[in-house]
Amino acid sequence: MRSLLILVLCFLPLAALGKVFGRCELAAAMKRHGLDNYRGYSLGNWVCAAKFESNFNTQATNRNTDGSTDYGILQINSRWWCNDGRTPGSRNLCNIPCSALLSSDITASVNCAKKIVSDGNGMNAWVAWRNRCKGTDVQAWIRGCRL
């Protein structure tokens, strides 16, 4: 029993770090956070963007050629939206550390995404959305989900 407790305590911090969501699980979480029809974008748009940006992985990171990094389930960029402490000239318009975007709790990612989508370019700010989701049947991404 004691060794089981030690094992659980060792892995507990890992559970808080990040998560790979299921499609419907993410759709439900995004809906709870108010993304369904936010700025006119249906929930399917957001789920599609997350699929092609991060494969539903909150811990996804990708380094860009300009030295910035994209973080989290929606691949939010450190040049403009968050501070990672290593991107020169970071604007940090969401006023958050980039590490907050890697959590299994998607609140910081959703709140920042709401600022991004309100910034004038809408979801065109996400290259993967523009290339893989825009103009497609994005409702397919939430079809069969109990929302």
From Swiss-Prot:
Signal peptide stretch: 1-18
The tissues in which it is expressed are: In the egg white and polymorphonuclear leukocytes.
Q: Could you state one GO biological process linked to this protein?
A: killing of cells of another organism
List, alphabetically, the InterPro entries matched: Glyco_hydro_22 (IPR001916), Glyco_hydro_22_CS (IPR019799), Glyco_hydro_22_lys (IPR000974), Lysozyme-like_dom_sf (IPR023346)
- Is Cytoplasm among this UniProt entry's keywords? no
Q: Where is the C-type lysozyme domain?
A: 19-147
Q: What is its EC number?
A: 3.2.1.17
Assigned GO CC terms: cytoplasm; endoplasmic reticulum; extracellular space
- Note in the entry: Lysozyme C is capable of both hydrolysis and transglycosylation; it also shows a slight esterase activity. It acts rapidly on both peptide-substituted and unsubstituted peptidoglycan, and slowly on chitin oligosaccharides.
Q: Which family does it belong to?
A: Belongs to the glycosyl hydrolase 22 family.
Its biological purpose is as follows: Lysozymes have primarily a bacteriolytic function; those in tissues and body fluids are associated with the monocyte-macrophage system and enhance the activity of immunoagents. Has bacteriolytic activity against M.luteus.
UniProt protein name:
Lysozyme C
